[in-house]
Regions:
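The canonical Cys-X-X-Cys-His
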Residues: 47-53, 108
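Gly/Gly-Pro-rich "capping" loops immediately C-terminal to redox-active cysteine motifs
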Residues: 51-80
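Axial heme c-ligation environment in periplasmic c-type cytochrome domains
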Residues: 58, 83-106, 112-115
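Processing junctions and N-termini across compartments
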Residues: 16, 22, 41-44, 85, ...
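N-terminal export/targeting leaders of redox proteins
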Residues: 1-37, 116-117
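Local sequence-structure signature of Cys/Sec-based thiol-disulfide redox active-site neighborhoods
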Residues: 37-49
């Protein structure tokens, strides 16, 4: 990406970050654009295999599946993210997202939660 586009993207991102958004999903989408991380694409590549089917006890993702997540969320979002980062039960550390950092994992968890409303 050339410097002009980078500068423009950074300026738009800075302005948009101070604007009022209709919901948190828009903020998440902006963050994905600004750092090149796309939670939906990464979910499909790294999380879908287990979380779409509930394999090995993974909480399912999809409309109306929040009840699968609620027992895990009783400990708080940070605990859910920590479990995803460190691994829990049959899930290995970072699931199958070996190139994800902790912020990426948090974005993936938030994406799965939003998708499960």
């Amino acid at each position: 990406m050339n410097n002009f586009l980078k500068s423009s993207l950074m300026a738009v991102t800075a302005f948009a970050a101070t604007a009022s958004f209709a919901n948190d999903r828009e903020v998440l989408q902006l963050a994905q654009v600004s750092d090149g991380f796309n939670a939906e694409q990464k979910y499909m590549a790294s999380c879908f295999a287990c979380h779409s089917t509930g394999a090995a006890g993974a909480p399912k993702v999809g409309a109306g599946m929040m009840s699968e997540w609620e027992p895990r969320l009783e400990k708080g979002l940070d605990a859910v993210v920590a479990n995803a980062v460190n691994g829990v039960n049959a899930m290995p550390a970072k699931g199958l997202c070996f190139d994800c950092n902790e912020d990426d994992i948090r974005a993936l968890v938030e994406y799965m939660l939003e998708t499960s409303q």
